[in-house]
Structure formats: structure tokens, C-alpha cells
């Protein structure tokens, strides 16, 4: 099952992003002021938690559950926006171009901050800044850039096919639903078969829930303060999804690659929380429409 999912999920994500980029004019991809506040929250919190973890390790050398919990929170904050966030944002009436722009910017920040801060917590002689930087770029950007280029080629070279794609407005959302079902199935299996103690699992679960609540709340608060976008709901929806809906598969990979392996489970827990919230938001939005 996991092997099949590892092949199918990237294809689904690529297709979702391709369909999303088909609906965005290249000139619409530009930064907004609220982007910088969200970057400050994600990057600043990650740096502060990294320093805190380093101080604890310096004072109490060795592996402990406390460092695992702090590292789990680090992952929850620095994890970039989910590639499917644009699909949910569009369903909720948000600005797809804005959240897509933020997704690109936050991935650049992650590529710089993670290699800079992780050595404070987990020094590794064979993991230089540029090695870690290249690992992250190779993991993230092909799945972001290739659908973008493919969509723009179709837009300008195959306009009839492009119009045909636009005639199926809910196709990306239906693909997201399939992708979500697969992700939840894999997540539940990983949690059930985890060898971690019940107490540590409960702690990681609580940390992931708290981080999820804080980020959705902060994003909506900041987005709302920047007013209304013509043709969309106010920025609260877009900013909330930008910082709250995470690329949890990437968080799991970062946990295994850069931090304590136990932290990788936090991506699974976060996936449950943000998808429960997304499902509730979509249900409420559809009920009010």
C-alpha cells in the first residue's frame, strides 16, 4: 500500500498544482504585505524554538522527550504550505494567486532556515549547510516548478485545451479529496504501528494540535487586518490556509532527515487536525452558500 501511495500521491499533487496554475495569470504571482508577517511567525518561532532546544541539550546532554516535543513544534511551525492549500482556498473563496505566491516564498525560507538552525540541535559532520539546502530544494521545488511551467505552456501554446481545463472548476477539489483519503489512511497506519510510548504520542499529538490552532488563528487574524480582495473573501481565509494548512509529508521527511526520528509522527497528527478543520470549513462554507 505504502509503495502505491508513494507513486500515486506525487501524481495527484502534480495534477492538482497543474490545474491550479492553469487558473493563475503569471502577473498575479506577487507578494503581499501579509506574507511578510506570516514568514516572520513561521521563521521566527522556528528559530526561537531551535535556540531553546539547543540550550536544553547544552544544559542536559542526551536525548529526552522534552527535546522531541520542542523539535516537533519546530517542525509544525517551519513546515511550508501544503501544495493542496490552493485547492481548499479556492473552494473557500480565497485568493489562489496569493496563497500560491506564499507557498513559493515559504519554501525558499525553509530551504535557508532549516540548514542554518538544525545544526544547533542536531550537529552532523556529514551535513553541511549547502548539502541540506540542496536536499530541501530537490525535495520541494520540482513538484512546485514543473506544474507551473506545464500550466503556462498549455496557457500560451494550447489555448483551446486550456479553456477546456477551465471548464471543469471542481476537478482539482475532487482530486484533493482522493489525495486526502490516501494521506489519512497512511497517517492512521503510521500512528497505530508507532513504537513510541503512549505518553510521548499524547504529547506530540497535543503539540501538533496547539500549533495547528495557533497558526490558523494567527493567519486569519493577520489576513483580516489587511482587508478585502475584490472578487474574493477577505484575506483571512487565504492567510489562514497559507500558514495553517501544511505540507505534512514534507514535515515527516524533515523529521527523519534532520531531527530526531520520533518527531516525524508529528506530521501525521498535524495532517489529521488541519484536515478536520478544512472539512469543517468547507461544510460551513457550502451551507452558507
Predicted segments with their positions:
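Alpha-helical transmembrane segments of multi-pass small-molecule/ion transporters
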Residues: 1-289
Amino acid at each position: 500500500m505504502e509503495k502505491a501511495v508513494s507513486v500515486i500521491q506525487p501524481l495527484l499533487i502534480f495534477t492538482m498544482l497543474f490545474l491550479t496554475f492553469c487558473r493563475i495569470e503569471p502577473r498575479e504571482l506577487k507578494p503581499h504585505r501579509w506574507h511578510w508577517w506570516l514568514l516572520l511567525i513561521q521563521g521566527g518561532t522556528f528559530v526561537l524554538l531551535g535556540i531553546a532546544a539547543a540550550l536544553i541539550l547544552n544544559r542536559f546532554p542526551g536525548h529526552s522527550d522534552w527535546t522531541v516535543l520542542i523539535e516537533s513544534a519546530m517542525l509544525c511551525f517551519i513546515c511550508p504550505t501544503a501544495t493542496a492549500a490552493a485547492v481548499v482556498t479556492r473552494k473557500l473563496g480565497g485568493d489562489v494567486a496569493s496563497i500560491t505566491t506564499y507557498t513559493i516564498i515559504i519554501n525558499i525560507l525553509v530551504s535557508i532556515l532549516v540548514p542554518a538552525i538544525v545544526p544547533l540541535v542536531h550537529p552532523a559532520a556529514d551535513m553541511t549547510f549547502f548539502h541540506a539546502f540542496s536536499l530541501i530544494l530537490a525535495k520541494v521545488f520540482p513538484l512546485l516548478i514543473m506544474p507551473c511551467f506545464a500550466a503556462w505552456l498549455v496557457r500560451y501554446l494550447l489555448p483551446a485545451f486550456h479553456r477546456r481545463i477551465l471548464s471543469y472548476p471542481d476537478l482539482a477539489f475532487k482530486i484533493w479529496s482522493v489525495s486526502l483519503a490516501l494521506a489519512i489512511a497512511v497517517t492512521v497506519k503510521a500512528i497505530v504501528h508507532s513504537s513510541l510510548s503512549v505518553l510521548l504520542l499524547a504529547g506530540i499529538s497535543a503539540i501538533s494540535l496547539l500549533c495547528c490552532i495557533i497558526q490558523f488563528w494567527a493567519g486569519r487574524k493577520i489576513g483580516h487586518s489587511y482587508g478585502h480582495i475584490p472578487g474574493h473573501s477577505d484575506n483571512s481565509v487565504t492567510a489562514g490556509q497559507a500558514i495553517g494548512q501544511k505540507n505534512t509529508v514534507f514535515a515527516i521527511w524533515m523529521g527523519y532527515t534532520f531531527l530526531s526520528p520520533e518527531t516525524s509522527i508529528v506530521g501525521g497528527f498535524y495532517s489529521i487536525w488541519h484536515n478536520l478543520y478544512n472539512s469543517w470549513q468547507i461544510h460551513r462554507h457550502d451551507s452558507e452558500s
